[in-house]
Amino acid sequence: MYYLKNTNFWMFGLFFFFYFFIMGAYFPFFPIWLHDINHISKSDTGIIFAAISLFSLLFQPLFGLLSDKLGLRKYLLWIITGMLVMFAPFFIFIFGPLLQYNILVGSIVGGIYLGFCFNAGAPAVEAFIEKVSRRSNFEFGRARMFGCVGWALCASIVGIMFTINNQFVFWLGSGCALILAVLLFFAKTDAPSSATVANAVGANHSAFSLKLALELFRQPKLWFLSLYVIGVSCTYDVFDQQFANFFTSFFATGEQGTRVFGYVTTMGELLNASIMFFAPLIINRIGGKNALLLAGTIMSVRIIGSSFATSALEVVILKTLHMFEVPFLLVGCFKYITSQFEVRFSATIYLVCFCFFKQLAMIFMSVLAGNMYESIGFQGAYLVLGLVALGFTLISVFTLSGPGPLSLLRRQVNEVA
């Protein structure tokens, strides 16, 4: 009953829904749009993704700084929303033509827009709503669940619309951005009675200075967290960048593969949403560290499994593993950050460790993976990436702070005894 009366839960849950609906129109089908619509090679696709990562590097630390400095003020979300209103005009009239004119110019312009709106924008949105969740007393994971549903529904719709007229997809995204603006206008995050609570969660602190930044970077546990992110999460994202092209290669035609990819993504994200609802309960019990290790194990299994896939059914099953990984990685990372660091720095740490360092590594790994796809094929490259992710997951058992799997096992044994 409490959640039914919590206005901010519904406002920001719906904000997640429409934001990730737009992101679902872009991210899963972006490689297909590049390859099938614009006829971009795998190597050039790697350059485009590297450019997106490069410009994300410029925005992510800035967004982390601003998010902690602004606290519960909505200025940054207004800018992101305004940019998303231009989603269709950008893809149709600017990005696509520029890629045909010059791949480097197109990559730079696309990198700026996509890096701002999604690669830096998505974690900034998540960090802001995580602050609101602590202030408004609702579980972040349950609000984030709406984003999974939005992504799922969009993937199914886009899978059909994309094969009819890909431009419809982009106009749908711009329309959803207008709904974001309405939700953001009516959302209230600055009620005077909550000022004390906001201060308690660090939302109203001016959180950044050179001295504070140096103090954060002197902590070994921040670097060990970054090691996990680069070795596991970054490797997985590189694997997932061109997975749509790998997936569609198992079908008789690209159109059939694209439609099935949309249906499978929808099914996976709906299951993802159901798991996201219960994830906070599980993660509160096992702890942030074990949640990250579990996510790393699932990611490694999916990547390595893809290297041995020989049929469409196998890649469908492997695709659905994504539904287990996202809740434990996303909710687990915030639980880990708020348990191991000062909560007033949560956005800065999230956007630096989980986003900035990841994008820095992806500049090099995207190009390397693109070259591997050309030289040894998708499956050979996936085996290499999977072993890398698995290796860093095992290392993180010893380097991440907090109770690990053995401590959890001992606690379970003691409870049974």
Curated annotation (Swiss-Prot):
Periplasmic topological segments: 35-41, 101-104, 164-166, 250-253, 309-311, 375-377
Regulation: Inhibited by the proton ionophore carbonyl cyanide m-chlorophenylhydrazone (CCCP).
Transmembrane segments: 8-34, 42-70, 75-100, 105-129, 141-163, 167-186, 221-249, 254-278, 289-308, 312-334, 347-374, 378-398
Marked site positions, Proton translocation: 302, 322, 325
Keywords: Cell inner membrane, Cell membrane, Formylation, Membrane, Sugar transport, Symport, Transmembrane, Transmembrane helix, Transport
Gene3D superfamilies linked to this entry: MFS general substrate transporter like domains
Family matches, as SUPFAM superfamilies: MFS general substrate transporter
UniProt subcellular location: Cell inner membrane
Site residues (Substrate binding), renumbered to this chain: 126, 144
Cross-referenced CDD domains: MFS_LacY (cd06172)
Claim: Cell cycle is one of the keywords in the record: no
A GO cellular-component term linked to this record: plasma membrane
Residues where N-formylmethionine is found: 1
Spans within the Cytoplasmic topological domain: 1-7, 71-74, 130-140, 187-220, 279-288, 335-346, 399-417
Outcome reported for the amino acid change (mutating residue 96 to A): No change in transport activity
InterPro entries assigned to the protein according to its UniProt record, in alphabetical order: LacY/RafB_perm_fam, LacY/RafB_perm_fam_CS, MFS_dom, MFS_trans_sf
Role summary: Responsible for transport of beta-galactosides into the cell, with the concomitant import of a proton (symport system). Can transport lactose, melibiose, the synthetic disaccharide lactulose or the analog methyl-1-thio-beta,D-galactopyranoside (TMG), but not sucrose or fructose. The substrate specificity is directed toward the galactopyranosyl moiety of the substrate.
Subunit structure as annotated in this protein's UniProt entry: Monomer.
Similarity comment: family membership: Belongs to the major facilitator superfamily. Oligosaccharide:H(+) symporter (OHS) (TC 2.A.1.5) family.
Descriptive protein name: Lactose permease
Gene source species: Escherichia coli (strain K12)
